[in-house]
Amino acid sequence: MQPGKVSNRSRYLTLLLIGLLAGFSTSQRLLAHHTDSHFEDSSKHRIVYQLNKADPAYLQHVLFSAGELMRKYGDDVEIVIGALGPGLHLIGKLPGHPIPTELQQRASSLAQYGVAFHACGNTMKSLGWEEKDLLPFAKIVPIGIDDIMQLQEQGFTYISW
């Protein structure tokens, strides 16, 4: 080969390298675009239930629905049950409404599988309840409906009966 001339092989390797780098760069931009418009884990489902009644049949339906989603999606679903108003009694140690023990046990079981139970702080104040009055898996939020709104703004699907 003469000095100053580039071989066909060198030219081919250079073009191949440029093509690979351009393809990699484009694919990274496409991936970045995809993740910018989705949650960190785009396959995860997010549900927030509003639990605002103490009726045992109603509580049964909500807990059954949450359990079915857990069975179907396992780790691919994040569930929050926002308890406010009379619904708060489900997660109270000494509920003021007649709540069947089996429903509290079911709520406890769901909590062990990752279902979060948020207790409305305003409702707690109106009942004269403190943190010690709740079952251990419950998390207090200042305003229950505000918590539900914020979860919706984070992409949670709102479910209410």
Report residues per predicted region.
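Short N-terminal alpha-helical targeting/association segments
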Residues: 3, 20-21, 42
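Bacterial N-terminal signal peptides that target proteins for export
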Residues: 3-15
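Bacterial N-terminal signal peptides
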Residues: 14-25
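Secreted/extracellular ectodomain signature
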Residues: 30-161
